[in-house]
Amino acid sequence: MKAKEIREMTNRELEAKLDELKEELFNLRFQVATGQIENPMRLKQVRKDIARVKTILRERELNIS
C-alpha cells in the first residue's frame, strides 16, 4: 500500500485499515511461531503499512499537510 493511497482515505477508513493490519500482523506472527508462514516478506510489508497508516493519522492530528 502506497502513502498516496493512504492519504486518500478518510480517518475512519484509516482506523479500520489499521485494525485490519494489526489483526493480520497477529496472525502472521502466529504462523511464524508455528512454522506455517508461506510468505515471510509479508510480515515486513504489514509492519511498514501499519507505520504508514499511523504516520498519516498523526499528521492529520497535528494538521500537517
From Swiss-Prot:
In its keyword annotation, does this UniProt entry include Lipid biosynthesis? no
SUPFAM superfamilies listed in its UniProt record:
Ribosomal protein L29 (L29p)
* Example of a GO cellular component annotation carried by this entry: cytosolic large ribosomal subunit
Molecular-function GO terms, alphabetical: structural constituent of ribosome
- Record keywords: Ribonucleoprotein, Ribosomal protein
Looking at the Swiss-Prot or TrEMBL record, what is one Pfam family this protein matches? Answer: Ribosomal_L29
InterPro entries noted in UniProt: Ribosomal_protein_uL29, Ribosomal_uL29, Ribosomal_uL29_CS, Ribosomal_uL29_sf
| Listed GO biological process terms | translation
Would the keyword Ligase turn up in this protein's UniProt record?
Answer: no
Top-level lineage group: Bacteria
User: What protein family does this chain belong to?
Assistant: Belongs to the universal ribosomal protein uL29 family.
Q: Please state what the protein is called.
A: Large ribosomal subunit protein uL29
Protein's organism: Natranaerobius thermophilus (strain ATCC BAA-1301 / DSM 18059 / JW/NM-WN-LF)
Name the gene.
rpmC
